[in-house]
């Protein structure tokens, strides 16, 4: 993968939330996830928000949070959840996701967080590849059910 040396990653600021919501929310560049709503975007923890930029333009974001005793992994205690990673289409393939993940890994290591989680769709093979390249390993699968009435 080519990497662009002009891509920088910085901590998120309150003024970044509007851009995150615009690009990720309804009507943005990303198909809206029915399990995420606007109120959830407003609760993004700023200490876990990372912004990637290229020549002053917004290239993508990553946000994460710290937690304790996840319900889905009974033996775990302290952990970090990489909640969302988004790279604008025109910046994909240039190492933006890799840089965001590298910064995330440095931040959680500095805080002494021993265990990291990320979840993605089973059809999102690009994300699976990115996470596996970063050292994440699959450990749990979930199934969503639906019923028409």
Placement of each model-derived feature along the sequence:
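Conserved acetyl-CoA-binding loop-helix of GNAT-fold acetyltransferases
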Residues: 87, 93-106, 129-133
């Amino acid at each position: 993968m080519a990497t662009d040396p002009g891509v920088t990653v910085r901590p998120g600021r309150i003024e970044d939330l509007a851009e995150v919501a615009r690009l990720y929310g309804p009507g943005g560049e990303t198909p809206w996830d029915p399990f995420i709503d606007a109120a959830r975007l407003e609760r993004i923890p700023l200490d876990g928000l990372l912004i990637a930029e290229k020549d002053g333009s917004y290239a993508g974001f990553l946000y994460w949070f710290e937690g304790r005793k996840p319900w889905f992994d009974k033996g775990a205690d302290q952990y970090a959840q990489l909640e969302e990673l988004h790279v604008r289409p025109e910046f994909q393939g240039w190492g933006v996701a890799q840089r965001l993940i590298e910064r995330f890994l440095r931040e959680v290591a500095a805080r002494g967080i021993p265990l990291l989680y990320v979840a993605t769709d089973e059809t999102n093979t690009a994300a699976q590849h990115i996470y596996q390249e970063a050292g994440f390993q699959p450990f749990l699968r979930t199934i969503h059910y639906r019923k028409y009435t």
